[in-house]
């Protein structure tokens, strides 16, 4: 087992070294960011597929949401992490965001399937499983989100990081766990189309969804820092 603290060694660097042409990725995490994609763009372009599970409800329709979407600020903020979390947005240019989102959108359509946990009270553990062959695979446990901060590329506020990397055959237990959840249609929902639509909104200039999020971000920026 190898320990990654994102100080002496970084998750992003380890993934760059471990991903091969034809790799298969399985990720369970709270958020997915286009800037994490950009950081690993060369490597992610070589994979065969990515299966991604949002560990808590994301892009899930709720009855009351139809009545007044402004009451669902936490959900909107979580979904907005796809185009960069609040800390990433301060570091990245918004015009550059559209270009990255467009490139990421094409990649997602080719290689990614997104599902989400339906239950607020049953958050899943975060992890990454990387399979290169039948006898070469790695698992990364204790990965909260798929963002540049969790990759160790940008600074992360709060508690220190400690990710455990396991090699084959120990990594197989994580893939088995992921597969059991992935195939659970009762508790997961496929949101691939919703995510693709969100990407398209993000890179279309002056789209209503993009303006809506930026407005919310500016209004609640100080509140989110507390």
Describe the predicted segments one by one.
Residues 1-226:
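PLD/PLD-like phosphodiesterase catalytic module centered on the HKD motif
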